[in-house]
Every structure is written in C-alpha cells, then in structure tokens.
Amino acid sequence: MELTILILLLPFFSFLLLGIGGKWMSHRTAGAIGTLVLGAVTVLSYVTAFQYFSAPRLEDGTFTTLIPYNFTWLPFTETLHFDLGILLDPISVMMLIVISTVSLMVHIYSFGYMKGEIGFQRYYAFLSLFTMSMLGLVVATNIFQMYLFWELVGVSSYLLIGFYYTKPAAISASKKAFIVTRFADLGFLIGILIYGYYGGTFGFTPVSYTHLTLPTIR
C-alpha cells in the first residue's frame, strides 16, 4: 500500500498542470490528461482495496486500521499537533473506490458534454481539485485534516458552481453555497478546537478518556 500517497498526489498535480498550463493546451489534451489521471487514481484505489481486504485480520475478525503515511505539520505540544497523512480502514477504503469511480465517470462524460466550452481546461482543473479534496477527506488521519480537506471541497464546489462566471445566476448560486456552508464550518472549527483543548489531541481518539473532562454547566 506504499502507492496510496499517489491517490492524493496525482489529482493534485493534475490540478496544478491544468490550472497553470491549461491555456496552452487544446481541449482534447486537457481532457485526456484529467481523465487519464483519474483513471490511474481509480486503478490505485481498487488495488489498495484489494490489498487491504486481503490482509490478515485481527484476532476478533475485524479489519485493522492502517496509517501508511503520516507526518506532523504544526506541532504544539507532545500530543497536540496538526498532522497530514492517510488512514485506511474499511470505510475509507470503500469510499476511495466510490469517489474515484464516480469522478472518473464524470471526467469521461464531461469530455463530450463540455466540448467547445470556453474554459474547458479550467473546468478539468477544478474537477481534479474537487476529487483530490474528497479523497483527502475520507482518508484523513485526524479531525483537523478532515476539516482542511472539507474546506477544500467547499472551495472547489464554489469554483465549479460558478464556472459560468459571466452568468449572474451561476455567480449568485456559487456565492450562496459558499457563504451558507461557511456558517456551519465555523461551528465545525469551534468544535475541533474545543475537542483538541479538552482531549489533548486532534486524533479521532482522545489521548485518554480519563483526562477528557468538560466544564460543568451551571
């Protein structure tokens, strides 16, 4: 499962390539790059799923949780830090298959549906960013990474909804979607900070439940 990092890196590099150099590419070239990259991501997702579900299980018959990649981004204390990595469990592995497969179908369909549209290359760049954001969300090793990629999902959704930026209706819809979700995201962020403060970590399991004490409500 050493290649799982490519599941995130490939669409990210596709986003950079199409976003920066897309204007010098033909529609066919840009669409082919985006689609082939997602094809590779889909294959890697299925390979990862096969390897994961073929691996030995725990004594109680459950699947183990694997973290093939994880590094500390911003350290605060010994246990409290922002990490970026990849966590594999049955849910995240199945979601890799769902996201990559659906995204590949969207890329293939868009190749003909968006044919001749102005900004075709930009559209495929946004699709790559959207896919990378969703993939990063489901394999997050901690709640802060989940929040980070959730915000990227919101940004890429805003860009895709407002793709036809010359149409007032598209601009209005993109702004509405972006602003409304930001209110909920603020609550999400506050909850994460409270969790980190009282739990001593941004991981999905507090360092010690015995030390997880909440203030008394009077």
Q: Predicted regions span which residues?
A:
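...captures the hydrophobic TM-helix bundle architecture rather than a specific catalytic motif
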Residues: 1-212, 218
